[in-house]
Design a protein with these regions (language model features):
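Substrate-binding pocket helix/loop in short-chain dehydrogenase/reductase
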Residues: 99-100, 107-112
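The beta1-alpha1 cofactor-binding region of Rossmann-like NAD(H)/NADP(H)-dependent oxidoreductases
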Residues: 41-42, 62-74, 105
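C-terminal helical subdomain
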Residues: 179, 183-184, 203-248
Length: 251
């Protein structure tokens, strides 16, 4: 495909649904070849078919970013199958309701392993190849919960605050090598993420909240990701906060 990202290769984690899926479609439409990573292989294959039907190129790389081996393999396989890696979109994420006292530690670990450490693993694997190319874009998807603590979503908010520190530190570390590092912080967005909340009352409340007419759609966030990736190499949007026009909650 031709487009503003023609010749570029992107890896998108969390590509089986929500923001990751929308980002993959937007990047492919803009001309990038896209590697799709997530745990749900059948959804990835469906997305590969959709992109191919529209004239784009995509490959599926199933895996779990909370596994360092899987996350590293996603980067390595992207390069092996598509030739390089120009854009890394870290969109894989989960949410859980609860606080320090109420939520078991294994739930805290699961959220932090996916949202924070999973991003660390893919970033670490991508830095070397991007340095060798002299360029690259790393775009980490966070949340407004990474700007203002949301006590009822303790591990989620904690992981997103950590992601802010990781992103800014990495930007300082690799900017001199021509690698741009950005964080995108969406407010309420209509995705499937609330389905992972174990408490049924909180799950229903969160699902209802993101289903409101004023909630943003994954395509809205994908447009922001595309904007960042398409900017001239001299420009790095280090942080982008995106809220619904009618913003009724912290997240």
């Amino acid at each position: 495909m031709t487009g503003i990202l023609a010749g570029k290769v992107a890896l998108v984690t969390g590509a089986s649904s929500g923001i990751g899926e929308a980002a993959a479609l937007a990047l492919a439409e803009a001309g990038a070849a896209v590697a799709l990573s997530a745990r749900r292989a059948e959804r990835l294959e469906g997305l590969v078919a959709r992109i191919a039907a529209a004239g784009g190129r995509a490959v599926a790389i199933p895996g779990d970013v909370s596994s360092e081996a899987d996350a590293t393999a996603a980067v390595e396989e992207t390069i092996a199958r598509l030739g390089r890696i120009d854009i890394l979109v870290n969109s894989a994420g989960v949410i859980q309701a609860g606080g320090v006292e109420s939520l078991p530690l294994d739930e805290w670990r699961r959220v932090i392993d996916i949202n924070l450490l999973g991003t660390l693993y893919t970033c670490k694997a991508a830095i070397g190849p991007m340095k060798a190319q002299g360029s690259g874009d790393i775009i980490n998807i966070s949340s407004t919960a990474g700007r203002r603590a949301a006590g009822i979503f303790g591990p989620y908010s904690t992981s997103k605050f950590g992601l802010t520190g990781l992103t800014e530190g990495l930007r300082q570390e690799v900017g001199g090598a021509g690698i741009r590092v950005s964080i995108v912080e969406p407010g309420a967005t209509a995705t499937e993420v609330a389905g992972g909340i174990s408490d049924p009352t909180m799950r229903a409340a969160m699902s209802q909240h993101v289903a409101k007419d004023g909630a943003m759609q994954p395509e809205d966030i994908a447009s922001a990701i595309l904007f960042i990736a398409a900017l001239p190499p001299r420009v790095n949007v280090s942080q982008m906060l995106i809220r619904p026009t009618i913003d009724t909650a912290a997240m």
